[in-house]
Each structure stands twice: as C-alpha cells, then as structure tokens.
Amino acid sequence: MNEVTMMAEDRAAGELRFTRVFEAPRELVFRCMIDPDHLTHFWGPQGTSAPRERITVDARPGGVFETVMVNDADGNEYATRAVYDEVREPELLAWTESHSGMKVVTRFVALGPDRTEVQIHQRFVPKAFLTPETQAGFSSSLDRFAAHLARVAAATSPDHAEKTGKRELR
C-alpha cells in the first residue's frame, strides 16, 4: 500500500491520520525524518523547498524541531517550530507545534527488512489545515519523501556497492 489514507471522520474532530508504506528499512526512514541533510530534500509539498541552513533538529524529549519552507514561485516563507515530546528510535516521534498547539505522533512500523509503514496522527489541527488543498499538499510531501527514500535506499543497497565499489551510508 503506497497510497496515503486519511480518515474523513477524524477531520471533523480536528484530527488527521495519514498512513503510507515506504520501500525502505525502518531505521533509514526514521533517520531521514530527524536528519536535516535528508529533510531538505523532501520537507514540504511540491513547489516548496526547505533550505538546509534553516532546518534545526534536536531529536530528544524537550528538543526543538524547526523548519522554514519557501514557496518556490513567490518566495513566501512558512516557519514551523515544534518541541519533541517523545523520541523512541526507530519507532516513534512525537512533537507539539509551538504556534498552533497541534500534536503530531509519527510511528514507524517495520513490515519486513526493506518496507516501513509510517502512521501519522495529527491532533488539534488548525481549521486552515483541514482543507482538501492542504491535505493534498501534505500528501505530495509524502510523495517527495518516497522519492528521496528510493534514491537513498538505492545508493545504500548491496547492488549499488557492487556497481560503484562503494556503499554510501547516511
């Protein structure tokens, strides 16, 4: 299942749930979600970028997660600041966004050595983020994440090492 699933009944309660399966090991999927060198490649919907120098991650309870997404078309910036409530590598990330109070819990479930289900549950979602357009944007960021994971997984595979003589571990 590589589709994003959302529960309409949760939307009415100010909650969103997204589930997506990625063709990559759980440890890699988790690492990409806490490493600014990876986040810069996929954080935000299509049409935005997240400059590496504007991403801060201190993945520990009480640590800060900060990003700035830049709209590629007009240069508008969208900042996010959150504080980690819980971090259990490679199983779970939970944070609360400072500006909205939205709580996000992301679970990483191994479905085998090279498949991971990511379950994202957002609570206290601001009404502005409950629109179909915003949800489509979030889904497109998961598409970008899948593409990034595919590139990284390919670069770290034994086949890649055999062809290039090196194995890139990130």
Residue positions per predicted region:
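Beta-strand/loop substructures that line and gate deep hydrophobic ligand-binding cavities in soluble
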Residues: 92-140
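A short, structured loop/turn motif at beta-sheet edges
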Residues: 26-27, 59-60, 85-90, 107-117
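Hydrophobic/aromatic beta-strand elements that line small-molecule binding cavities or substrate pockets
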Residues: 20, 54-57, 80-86, 103-110
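Short beta-edge strand/loop motif at the mouth of beta-sheet-based domains
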Residues: 17-18, 37-77, 158-162, 166-170
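A conserved amphipathic terminal alpha-helix motif
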Residues: 123-170
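Hydrophobic pocket/interface hotspot
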Residues: 29, 39, 65-67, 84, ...
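Intrinsic-disorder/low-complexity, polar/charged segments enriched in Ser/Thr/Lys/Arg/Asp/Glu/Gln
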Residues: 13-19, 26, 52, 64, ...
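Hydrophobic ligand-binding cavity/cleft-lining segments
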Residues: 1-49, 170
